[in-house]
């Protein structure tokens, strides 16, 4: 069947539903066979819980759904507890960069409905798009669409949206996600860069993604009020560029970067090392 789809439609990968119940030997054989069809053919599986490393390895799947991070993100913001997110990232550090990350999908209540504070949508997506993993945006998420499943129906999670409505649905979140997508595409640190925790409290969180001679630092604030963060910078550098604020320059003094974050917001900062 996979060979038919490759030969007929030139597909580059497949998503395996309920991969947690598939036979491991079958997945190993599938990996071997698809590699002969296309060297870079991608296999991604839906796995709700368990040791993700059992599925994600050189012999089976390239990626699985990171439901653990999904839960940590919405509850970490709702409970003002960034420790939950940071703990999850540390625990999955060995394979986290290969996992498929999300805050919405076709089986889960919309993140805009799960969050108690709707203003958290901006830092939630800033977090998703810069933490280790392969981030995804479920359609409608870019407009902050709400939706909850019921015991008998999931239709609210999958509304029909006319292209004629796109312009009227556009909002601040739409522009933020668009900018985050460009940032993710253009900065290799966010692809497979090493993660390093820099600052952590219940309501503020900063982490770095390492490149060879550069860093991306993400700073997040889940408090309603603005917060001043003094972030240690693990690289010799004199300034940082705020990628979400049209290239605003921030000085680095004595190895620390000071930034003021608005309530319920975040920043993505690019730092290039000094030779």
Region annotations inferred by a language model:
Residues 13-15, 42-45, 100-102, 129, ...:
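Structural recognition of the beta-strand scaffold that forms the well-ordered cores
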Residues 95-116:
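Active-site clefts of carbohydrate-active enzymes
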